[in-house]
């Protein structure tokens, strides 16, 4: 069913945009993904990004790409868009610790990664920059430091206001890298950490 839908969408997109260069407002992950999908279907694209470079508004913060949100594994899902996931620097997370105020930490494990940890930003090891490089190699055109024209075909400029604010901390330790999920009012009122 998924393959039929994907094939239908590819045909629909190819028919609609075959005669022009598709204009995309926003060079975040959504804009890059839209451009790569179209470009891999032989549809020319141009991305308008108001920042001077891709990932410029992020600063090396970490994000988890959940493996369970895709119909197939994350590698296949990225391939369907046109990206090569094996060229993206990431750390598969197969286990993590869950903390509550009433129990000892519980270790959760799985053979298949729960998610892949990636850094965000404009450095060479950040996912934003790595997706940008793959888009450039595929022929996506970029216009930096200018607002998108009002007649863009795809709007991928993100939200106007953050839906959550996250505070992080970096510190040196002799321990191996690890992931901890903190639940409950004591650790994270109205959310999780």
Label every model-predicted segment.
Residues 55-102:
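N-terminal FAD cofactor-binding segment of flavoenzymes
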Residues 27, 125-193:
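Predominantly flavin-linked oxidoreductase catalytic cores and closely associated redox partners
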Residues 36, 40, 133:
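Short, well-ordered alpha-helices that flank and scaffold nucleotide-derived cofactor binding pockets
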Residues 25, 39-61:
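Glycine-rich FAD pyrophosphate-binding loop
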Residues 1-22, 40-41, 148:
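Extreme N-terminal leader/targeting segments of oxidoreductases
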Residues 22, 43-45, 153, 179:
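Hydrophobic anchor at the start of a short beta-strand
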Residues 69-72, 110-133:
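Short beta-strand to alpha-helix junction loop
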Residues 31-32:
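N-terminal Rossmann-fold NAD(P) dinucleotide-binding loop
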């Amino acid at each position: 069913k998924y393959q039929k839908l994907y094939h239908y969408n590819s045909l629909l997109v190819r028919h609609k945009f075959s005669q022009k260069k598709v204009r995309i407002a926003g060079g975040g992950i959504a804009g890059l993904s839209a451009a790569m999908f179209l470009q891999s279907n032989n549809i020319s694209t141009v991305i308008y990004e108001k920042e001077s470079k891709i990932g410029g508004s992020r600063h090396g913060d970490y994000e988890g790409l959940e493996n369970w949100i895709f119909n197939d594994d994350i590698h296949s899902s990225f391939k369907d868009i046109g990206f090569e996931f094996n060229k993206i620097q990431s750390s598969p997370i197969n286990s993590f610790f869950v903390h509550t105020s009433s129990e000892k930490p519980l270790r959760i494990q799985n053979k298949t990664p729960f998610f892949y940890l990636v850094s965000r930003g404009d450095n060479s090891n950040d996912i934003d920059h790595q997706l940008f490089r793959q888009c450039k190699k595929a022929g996506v055109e970029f216009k930096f430091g200018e607002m998108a024209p009002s007649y863009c075909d795809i709007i991928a400029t993100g939200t106007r206001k953050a839906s959550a604010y996250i505070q992080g901390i970096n510190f040196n330790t002799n321990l191996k890298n690890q992931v901890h999920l903190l639940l409950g009012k004591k650790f994270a009122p109205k959310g999780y950490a």
